[in-house]
Design a protein with these regions (language model features):
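Short active-site-adjacent structural elements
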Residues: 152, 183-188
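An accessory alpha-helical subdomain
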Residues: 171-184
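Hydrophobic, aromatic-enriched interface-forming segments
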Residues: 153-158
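N-terminal catalytic or cofactor-binding beta/alpha core of small enzyme domains
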Residues: 2-147, 160-165, 171, 189-221
Length: 221
């Protein structure tokens, strides 16, 4: 998996430890991707002394990891149409199995994200603390046990593999949140302002919780 140079005007490196917040460009024929609209809305805000830096990723296999800011924390956002809540991903798996082509026309099937890499990585952000923070902000939220097998999972696994190699700053953490459709894109949906508020709350929780909390958020199947 090849790191990609930042490709938006919001991606100039900032002084001090940053929070890197990424979203995707539109894919699958959609006009907008709410993941990028959320990241763009939070760009420049300060959270507990860390400045949020937004960067847009292309929905393309093998080119979807931005790592230019030496961030203390990286949170990647992606669209999961059909979900009704912000979905904090627990795990990324080492497989690409694309149901549709990416924006470059590639459709890998049963290929590894990282050849020779482990089967999976857990997100290193405090997902339960983030869940509680988002819910307390009044925004629907859940812990998800699968990030799929498309580009979102590819990015989550790739990010965690990069952090595991020790090339990021010591103590750097990362994770992924899937977001629903916007109003007018499909059902179920959430208003953009609610999703922005929820991700803002998730970032605060991630920064302020060096260790996760015990909170029931599992599934039976």
């Amino acid at each position: 998996m090849t790191p990609m140079a930042p490709d938006t005007l919001h991606s100039a490196p900032q002084a001090g430890p940053a929070i890197l917040l990424t979203g995707f460009d539109p894919f699958g024929g959609g006009a907008h991707n709410p993941s990028w609209l959320i990241a763009e809305a939070l760009h420049g805000q300060r959270i507990a002394g860390h400045q949020v830096v937004a960067a847009q990723l292309p929905t393309v296999f093998g080119q979807s990891l931005v790592q230019a800011h030496q961030p203390a924390l990286t949170l990647c956002l992606g669209l999961a149409g059909g979900r009704a809540a912000l979905s904090i991903e627990r795990i990324g798996i080492n497989i690409n199995d694309a149901r549709i082509p990416d924006n470059a026309g590639a459709q890998p099937i049963d290929t590894p994200v990282q050849s020779g890499g482990p089967a999976a990585y857990f997100a290193s952000l405090p997902i339960k603390a983030m869940l509680r923070g988002v819910q307390r902000a009044g925004v629907p939220c859940e812990v998800s046990q699968t990030a799929g097998t498309f580009v979102c999972n590819h990015v989550l696994y790739g990010l965690m593999h990069l952090l595991a190699q020790g090339t990021a700053p010591q103590g750097a953490r990362g994770g992924f949140v899937h977001v629903p459709w916007l109003s007018g894109q499909g059902e179920p949906h959430l208003p953009l302002r609610d999703m922005v508020r929820g991700i803002h709350a998730a970032l605060w929780a991630a920064v302020l919780a060096p260790q996760d909390i015990a909170l029931q958020a599992g599934d039976t199947h």
